[in-house]
Amino acid sequence: MVRMKKARKTEKANKAKKDITADTEASVVDVNSLSGKKVDKFKLNPDIFGAKVNKPLLHDTVVMHQANQRQGNTSTKSKGFVRGGGKKPWRQKGTGRARAGSIRSPLWRHGGVIFGPVPRDFSYEMPKKMKALALISSLSAKSKDNEIMVLEKDLELKQPKTKEIAKLLDALKSCSERVLFLYSTRNENLIKSCRNIKNVTLKTCSDFNTYDVLSNRKLLFSKDTHDAIVKRLKK
């Protein structure tokens, strides 16, 4: 009996080890030139793009993000806040009617609302480590779904050119898909070039979050941006 238990524990440990090894295998993706042609292969960092995907944590992070976006200004009036209703409609006894104390009772037309919503703050925060793990999980999920595109270098535009970005997306066959475009350093020309394209979300590698990754179909960044993302998440 003891030997059987030890054998089961060893088997479980080996299985877990295999699962971890499988999860930490990062994808090898194609490197695209700025004209959209495949020029090389690139191995994504296994700790960031090959980790185990924690679906419950991803769900919690998305719920938190959506809660933080709520304005929280919905408002209703209870019996005490509706105008009027201070006088008792009729005497308590002797009329044959049901007793009533106010015409603004929730049972009456134009009455108050019972336990209705009032303005409040819905926002809350998660621990920093959980946020970081959720972001790693989202990047790993994109890697496993082959939804990451890598450029050989950052785009350097001398002037705003929406046409150049549209041409690149067309070459990468991502015109009709939602794309999260990450870049390492702020570039005003790039921002102006992308803001008129409906399906493109432009973010720096220091301020994108889990919701940004999951709400877009494809992820696009350069080799330098990849290194900056790894540096951010390995702190």
Regions found by a protein language model. Name each.
Residues M1-A67, Q71, P117-K235:
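Extended polybasic, low-complexity segments that bind anionic RNA or targeting/receptor surfaces
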Residues K79-F115:
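Glycine/serine-rich anion-binding loops at beta->alpha junctions
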